[in-house]
UniProtKB/Swiss-Prot annotation:
Protein name stated in the entry: Probable V-type proton ATPase subunit H 2
Family: Belongs to the V-ATPase H subunit family.
A GO CC annotation given for this chain: vacuolar proton-transporting V-type ATPase, V1 domain
GO molecular function, one term: proton-transporting ATPase activity, rotational mechanism
Quaternary assembly: V-ATPase is a heteromultimeric enzyme made up of two complexes: the ATP-hydrolytic V1 complex and the proton translocation V0 complex. The V1 complex consists of three catalytic AB heterodimers that form a heterohexamer, three peripheral stalks each consisting of EG heterodimers, one central rotor including subunits D and F, and the regulatory subunits C and H. The proton translocation complex V0 consists of the proton transport subunit a, a ring of proteolipid subunits c9c'', rotary subunit d, subunits e and f, and the accessory subunits vah-19/Ac45 and vah-20/PRR.
Amino acid sequence: MAEVAHHNIPAVDMINATSRLQLEAAEVRSNKPNWGSYFRSKMIQEDDYTLVTSYENAKSKDERDQVIAANDANGQLAKTMANLITQVAKDQNVRYVLTLFDDMLQEDKSRVEIFHKAAHRQKRTAFSQYLGILQRQDNFIVNQMSSIIAKLACFGVTRMEGQDLQYYFSFLKEQLKNSTTNEYMNTTARCLQMMLRHDEYRHEFVVTDGVQTLVTALNGKTNFQLQYQLIFSVWCLTFNADIAKKTPSLGVITALGDILSESTKEKVIRIILASFVNILNKVEEREIKREAALQMVQCKTLKTLELMDAKKYDDPDLEDDVKFLTEELTLSVHDLSSYDEYYSEVRSGRLTWSPVHKSEKFWRENAAKFNDKQYEVVKILIKLLESSSDPLILCVASHDIGEYVRHYPRGKTVVEQQQGKAAVMRLLTAEDPNVRYHALLAVQKLMVHNWEYLGKQLDSDAQGDGVAAK
């Protein structure tokens, strides 16, 4: 059986927290369609009419089970639901059928297999006939359908695969990207929570840039309930060791660390700490584990843990997580070199004027290390020059490219081969004066041969321009 995320953190039940979809569904249930009129007008078939009215009139789960059993063997239940969803014209009535369908699966998870078996008999998947509904214009219909698809994918033993899975994850990611306009974001997050509890779905989500989409959503303005749901999805992903070791390079730790340093909601704090514990436990490669720990330290996680340790929680899991992380992160700090610190900062993409950037000793001792892993650090710095809009990051990256060139004899050649010279020169026309200043210094270092002369010239330029190096 596939690994499913387990911990004493509430599972996907917390999803039943009131959402826009659930509020609207309550109203939809009270507006039953006039199926008799549809039948008399020959807009639905007699089999569909008989089944849906019998199911509506059933007063208990036992009675509903009897209706389902009577229509299971011949596949009529699955056929009727598909017919009513795809053939009924009015959105209001499609809303009703989808809500009925969702309630049916929520009441008894095993019912999903009825739909999978019926689809199998038709040599198709249960998902394929419903994925097209996600393109409808009515947002309630789209999100209720999405919720049903997630249940079909998670409640039984049949899993979504191939193009169906790619299409569905692509849909969910688009919904996440529209976080400012998507009024059903809690439903989108709920579907992700359900899907990512199953290891079979995690890899596909990651290879289609799902993690980056999650991180972007987390970095946006979200209420704490949605924040919790999105972090829950991240937590689920960290149960997979291959995914856990990618988290330092995908901005996951930094995003969670920023939220941790500001959040006052205990359940948000707990899920972040549980995610950090997973990452450190799952990653076996010493270097990656060390980098992950260092990113946590840079996000002031130790300070948060210190404050939490002063409180007393009636939760042994939380206490264990606080103790484990405190020990691991403290050890990582003690075993830290200046290059480790610098490397982690560069990999995180969040450059600041930390002491190492201005340390002559650091550059003398470590410039050659920029060539490790096929010039990884140089490539990251150049990528930041090309893609970042943050003046501070652009200043520091320009400065570091210049220092690398100054301290490594072949640095100019390496930077030019990686298109770094062009990236720096483009910043000579940047709006921010400090960016222009540091770009100019870097360009001069890329072109000059006499370093003693350059040092005097830079001092003179700085005094003349009156620009402070920030």
